[in-house]
A protein has these predicted regions:
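Histone-fold modules and their flanking histone-like tails across chromatin and transcription assemblies
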Residues: 1-14
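C-terminal engagement/docking regions of AAA+ P-loop ATPases
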Residues: 8, 17-97
């Protein structure tokens, strides 16, 4: 079971990557679908039939790492994709249970 608030959370994360100041090419809607599928799998592995925000937070870097491209100036500054993904995640408020 996936609550609408979790789906909205994933959509917000994807939207942030498309408007983030250090990201040149953000994640596509398909990346959001893959985050959702991965989060459902993680929930099942933990014996749950529901997804929690921490599932999304844990798996988002794994799903997005190869799907976004940093701006050249961000790369020159030494920023890493994982750092930018973490900043993006931190900027989106997770739903409360």
């Amino acid at each position: 079971i996936v609550e609408p608030s979790i789906i909205n959370y994933i959509v917000s994360i994807i939207a942030k990557t498309r408007n983030w100041h250090t990201i040149e090419v953000g994640a596509s809607p398909r990346a959001g679908v893959n985050i959702l599928l991965a989060a459902r799998a993680m929930a099942a592995c933990h014996g749950r039939d529901f997804v929690v925000p921490d599932d999304v937070k844990t798996l988002t870097p794994w799903v997005l790492r190869h799907r976004i491209r940093l701006r050249p100036d961000a790369e020159i500054e030494g920023l890493l994709v994982d750092d930018v993904i973490r900043e993006t995640l931190d900027s989106v408020e997770a739903p409360r249970r």
